[in-house]
Amino acid sequence: VVCGDIIGDIDRRPPLFEPVSEALAASGVAFFYVAGNHDMDLGVRTSDRAKRSFKEHFGPTYYAFDRGRVHYVVLDDCFYIGRSYLYVGYLDERQLRWLEQDLATVPAGRTVVVCLHIPTWSRAARSGEWSREESHKVLNNRRALYRMLEPYNAHILSAHEHYNENYTPEPHLFEHVHAPLSTLFWQAPWSMDGIPAGYGVYEFDGDGLTWYYKAADHPRSRQFTAYGVGEDRRRPDAVTVNVWNWDPAWQVVWYENGEPRGPMTRYTGYDLSLIHI
């Protein structure tokens, strides 16, 4: 699943949709596409018209399908407001009605995976600073979506931000935010969180779902960046570790010479890889 921003701004590089779709098709892997803000036609009068080029190359901007016991839904939450490059995170009434009808066919308790571009929640909301939410970085009418997903074991796959993040906005919901393969707009091999360019891998067994992060230039077993004592001048006496795609449910324990030394203390800071660019 490509969670949007398939290319750079379409108005500046209009030929790219076709070669990108051809290259992905040549891989022999089935790809499903989500519309992102960089995939919109600009300068048009409505959000519907902003998705014309996307639809010509990839089909509808919202749709659903089943694979095994899992129901997948792709939504379009990039709402173009008809001026310049401006857009907001929003699901219109037509799309919400369609989603109601689609979910009416899905038994309660089933695993549902929702793919969209703009994340449903924000760091500002999670810290209680609602007034700091930016309308183009969050799904503004997320509560409507959350209510529809209440009967299910739901996972939301989103993108838009240039970092990886995991959180549970509601007890029945788990959202996975994915950084782009372009990381910092191709200017560095790391995203804003100091994690190497890569992608999320999701494995299903019946209704069950597990996941891990796969850095493009590293084996699956590589899941963190570690800095020894003295490398981080802000914490000169500490071993510092950036755990890739960290999950709030995890406890990180450090070992020395094969012996456990106890849980590590979590803090918010800067990865040394980015500081030294």
State the predicted function of each range:
Residues G4-D5, G36-N37, H117, A159-H160:
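Active-site glycine-centered loops adjacent to acidic/histidine catalytic or metal-binding residues
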Residues V1-D9, G36, T111:
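Active-site beta-strand/loop signature of hydrolases that rely on acidic residues for catalysis
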